[in-house]
């Protein structure tokens, strides 16, 4: 019998006659030498970060599912480069001594585990040290509680700090962790600007200018990677951080540039103008209208004293509260509340008149002007042709007015609303029937209530930045940040010039940057860039029509970076079927089409692909929301939008997901196909079948020689026993 390796609890099992480490209980048969896997039932981490020092407390509950009393080792891989200053361990509440092993000794242990367990998962950590603790006894069918506290210095580059936390993750369909939670209390000595987690979706709550909490909670948790957090401090109005990824110096690199205002105490309070344009047609009757009224009341209560505002309701015709923008005063707010209370849902939908009325005020606006546009329908009065309506609104809006759209329900024209936000550099939001309008609008309004810098423009001097997403830069608000992902050529020192307006006056900021000539760090930047690129192209297909050139580029990028969504999966399967039919690729070189689940899921994926062309309905709303998430992707979960719709039941009755067979290693995707992991870099070669292959048997002397001579192979080898990958210009194939 083969026992799998547990990343954090390794149980060395030998026969009774060897070292008497296990005493089996009759009538249990004597186990064979090997490794048991303890089930990790719960995981809790609490972290206190004080500028550049972190104290991490990890509590884990492991379950021994056997009827045997076991001896084993608890092993905890340390973050790469971590300088652990002190640590303590507790077993079931009793403090116990452990040992701290350097990377060399740890690698020897990892390799020995691979030899005995025939499971290469730990090779991913072969360059890292570890904490090890002997545990005895581990009682049968009982929970083993382990608590670990350690302190270490954070990695730092300039004024950007990074924190890493090892998480239990595997590549072979691990059992989910019943409960998982992480809470970070972050304190800094200077103004805290960027807070960024690329690996998981987290909640970030700022508590003043120098403190924040970061965390997540999950049930049935499965982690695809370790946890990483970046944060940046800066005493000035704006902060910036740059992350480069460039594994090959001969090729263009990838960059992630983040700009943030933080909650800077001395940031100037920028006055804004805002118009609330609300659909009051008959279809908005009932609960929808009441929620819309509540949302408007919330926004009115949170206007700044120096703001100007107006309310416009529209049905068969448009009616404004004021003739134009008016100051925030007690009298005007009282009129506004009465205007909201008197709203009734009746009549048609005259979008043209309402939006043109709101845009008229742009002539008098000498500061940021926002329009919040809420509707649940399509234009039925006035200009009803979407393209003509967009032309009229575009001619009226010179580009200074931001239109933020809220589509309510599923019967709206998503293409119209999305194009409206695109041409005005706004943002789109949808409220499904089961969602609350008030919550969606109020959450959004709090984010835009305090603009810091508007009408942004940027350029980089010293290196060439290209293929940057998003294509247009949004305004920057207090407590918020925005990021740009792109490619670059050249390297070394560069300068970012950022210009914008603060209270109607032009301001220019310059930031020093340094782009790496070659670096293996920050490999997540490549798939995030891939997600934004694919999202942008899918939006072009949605809004402007499909073309072979666009589809081919979506397929290429999605394959390379593992952007597996219901939309891209169908396009990949369709493309591979064509390639196989023309004998351009072998079946073992396909990524999705030859997987049974890929073929069975194809009809469902086709429905999703059809949603790209539909301009209304639930599927169209979902496509708009998911693709916008891809357009602004800044964590790995956003590279697989719509993942829940890729679920299926395998022949054994187990719940699976098509995306589970995709992992990112060294900035590109690896695909599990019929038991073998295949590197997308091989599959995307023009003639992959003609490439020279180095064949190596798993767990052989040559296998460990490859690991020692080419340490970069560890990440690929950790995927499993059967892998084919490209490294240093050569193809390596490991097989049992």
Predicted regions and their residues:
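Beta-strand-connecting loop/turn residues
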Residues: 52-54, 129, 159, 210-212, ...
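Pro/Ser/Thr/Gly-rich intrinsically disordered low-complexity regions
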Residues: 16-46, 88-90, 94-96, 103, ...
């Amino acid at each position: 019998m083969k026992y799998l390796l547990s990343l954090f609890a390794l149980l060395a099992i030998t026969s009774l006659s060897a070292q008497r480490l296990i005493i089996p209980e009759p009538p249990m048969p004597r186990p064979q030498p090997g490794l048991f896997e303890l089930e990790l039932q719960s995981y809790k981490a609490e972290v206190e970060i004080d500028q550049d020092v972190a104290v991490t407390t990890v509590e884990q509950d492991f379950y021994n599912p056997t009827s045997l009393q076991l001896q084993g080792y608890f092993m905890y891989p340390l973050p790469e480069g971590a300088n652990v200053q002190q640590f303590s361990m507790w077993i079931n509440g009793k403090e116990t001594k452990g040992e701290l092993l350097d990377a060399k000794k740890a690698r020897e242990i990892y390799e020995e585990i691979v030899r005995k367990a025939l499971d290469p998962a730990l090779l991913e950590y072969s360059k890292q040290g570890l904490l090890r603790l002997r545990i005895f006894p581990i009682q049968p069918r009982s929970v083993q509680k382990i608590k670990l506290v350690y302190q270490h210095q954070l990695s730092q580059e300039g004024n950007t700090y990074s924190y890493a936390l090892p998480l239990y993750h595997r590549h072979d369909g691990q059992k989910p962790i019943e409960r998982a939670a992480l809470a970070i209390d972050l304190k800094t000595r200077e103004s805290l600007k960027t807070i960024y987690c690329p690996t998981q979706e987290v909640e970030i709550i700022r508590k003043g200018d120098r403190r924040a909490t970061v965390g997540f909670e999950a049930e049935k948790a499965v982690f695809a990677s370790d946890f990483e957090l970046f944060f940046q401090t800066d005493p000035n109005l704006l902060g910036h951080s740059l992350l480069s990824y460039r594994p090959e110096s001969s090729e263009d690199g990838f960059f992630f540039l983040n700009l943030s205002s933080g909650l800077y105490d001395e940031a100037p309070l920028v006055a804004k103008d805002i118009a609330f344009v609300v659909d009051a047609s008959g279809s908005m009757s009932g609960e929808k209208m009441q929620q819309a009224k509540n949302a408007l009341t919330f926004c009115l209560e949170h206007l700044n004293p120096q703001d100007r505002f107006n309310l416009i309701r529209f049905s068969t015709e448009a009616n404004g509260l004021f003739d134009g923008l008016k100051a925030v005063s007690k009298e005007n707010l009282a009129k506004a509340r009465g205007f909201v209370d008197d709203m009734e849902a009746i009549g048609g939908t005259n979008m043209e008149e309402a939006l043109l009325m709101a845009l008229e005020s742009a002539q008098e606006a000498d500061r940021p002007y926002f329009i919040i546009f809420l509707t649940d329908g399509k234009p039925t009065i006035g200009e009803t042709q979407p393209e003509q309506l967009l032309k009229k609104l575009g001619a009226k809006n010179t580009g200074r007015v931001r239109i933020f759209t809220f589509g309510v329900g599923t019967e709206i024209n998503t293409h119209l609303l999305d194009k409206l936000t695109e041409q005005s550099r706004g943002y789109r939001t949808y409220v499904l029937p089961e969602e609350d309008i008030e919550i969606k609008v109020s959450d959004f309004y709090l984010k835009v209530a305090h603009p810091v810098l508007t009408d942004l423009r940027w350029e980089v001097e010293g290196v060439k930045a290209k293929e940057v997403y998003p294509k247009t830069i949004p305004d920057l608000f207090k407590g918020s940040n925005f990021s740009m992902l792109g490619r670059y050529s050249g390297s070394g020192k560069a300068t970012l010039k950022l210009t914008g307006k603060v209270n109607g006056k032009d301001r220019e900021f310059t930031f020093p940057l340094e782009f790496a000539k070659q670096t293996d760090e920050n490999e997540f930047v490549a798939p995030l860039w891939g997600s934004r690129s694919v999202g942008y192209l899918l939006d072009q297909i949605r809004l402007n029509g499909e073309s072979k050139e666009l589809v081919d580029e979506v397929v290429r990028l999605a394959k390379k970076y593992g952007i597996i969504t219901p939309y891209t999966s169908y396009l990949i399967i369709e493309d591979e079927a064509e390639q196989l039919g023309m004998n351009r690729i072998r079946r073992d070189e396909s990524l999705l089409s030859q997987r049974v689940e890929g073929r069975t899921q194809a009809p469902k994926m086709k429905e999703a692909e059809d949603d790209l062309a539909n301009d209304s309905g639930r599927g169209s709303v979902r496509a708009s929301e998911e693709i916008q998430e891809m357009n602004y992707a800044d964590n790995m979960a956003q590279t697989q939008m719509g993942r829940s719709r890729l679920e299926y039941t395998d022949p054994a009755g187990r719940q699976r997901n098509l995306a589970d067979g995709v992992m990112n290693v060294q900035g590109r995707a690896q695909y599990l196909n019929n038991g073998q992991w295949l590197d997308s870099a091989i599959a995307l070669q023009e003639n992959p079948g003609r490439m020279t292959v180095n064949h190596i048997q798993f767990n052989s002397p040559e296998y460990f020689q490859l690991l020692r001579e080419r340490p970069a192979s560890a990440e690929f080898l950790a995927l499993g026993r059967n892998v084919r990958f490209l490294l240093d210009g050569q193809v390596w194939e490991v097989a049992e």
